[in-house]
Every structure is written in structure tokens, then in C-alpha cells.
């Protein structure tokens, strides 16, 4: 297992991974289709430069990923990371890949002076078991405000 940052050189493998994930578990995906052309454009769009996707690679194929952002607060200098996506293909689960992806995130956090991350976790039995295995982490029910803006 190797780990790579998503970029133009592995975008096609990433798209193939998303197609597989969409076919296997469409209910866990946040989109109805894989926006292949959009992905090809986003990997080089400066707007997404602050987004990091680490891909778990097995023999040239993407089998899992973690996507996150670093950000900070001007007022107090607080630095943190937000994880917005973690997914491992069904055939590769229970092999420690998700834990390895989080380890890659934590190394990147350390290199950037970040000492905590958070995520809005999925609400299903498998996710609860996985996140429940984290040491030094708290699973909280935090009220979230989400508002979709009209274009």
C-alpha cells in the first residue's frame, strides 16, 4: 500500500475509484454521478489548492481516500484541520487502510503545526465502530448549521 496526493497524474485512477464506489454504495456517496470532467479541471484549479486528498494506492489503483483542509482563526491563531471525506472500497475494508489514511493526515498536521482535526461523521453502524476505535477522540452530537446559497 502506498499513499499519493491527488493530482493530474493520478486523476484517472481516482475517477475509476469513484465510479466503483458509486456502483457499490450509491447511498454513501454525496453525488448522483461522477463528474469526471469537473474532477479533471479541479485538480489544477487554484481554488482547490487548499484541499488535500490522500489516495491509498494498491498496484496503481485507488482503493481509499481521505480529503481534508487546514484552516485557522485570525483572532487567536488557532490552527486545525477539517476532514470532509474518508472512504475505502468495500473489498479493501478491515485491512487498516482507513487508519493508515488518518495516520497520513496526522503526519501532515504535524508538519503544519496543527494539533487537532474534526469531521462530521457518517451515521451508520460501520462508521460508529470505526470512529469509536480512535484513542483520545470524542464523538459528540454537535449542532451543525448548513445553509445552501442560491446561485
Please annotate each region the language model reported.
Residues 43-55:
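A short helix-loop-beta-strand connector motif used in the catalytic cores of GNAT acetyltransferases and
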Residues 8, 22-42:
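Conserved GNAT-fold acetyl-CoA-binding loop/helix
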Residues 123, 132-141:
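Conserved acetyl-CoA-binding loop of GNAT-fold acetyltransferases
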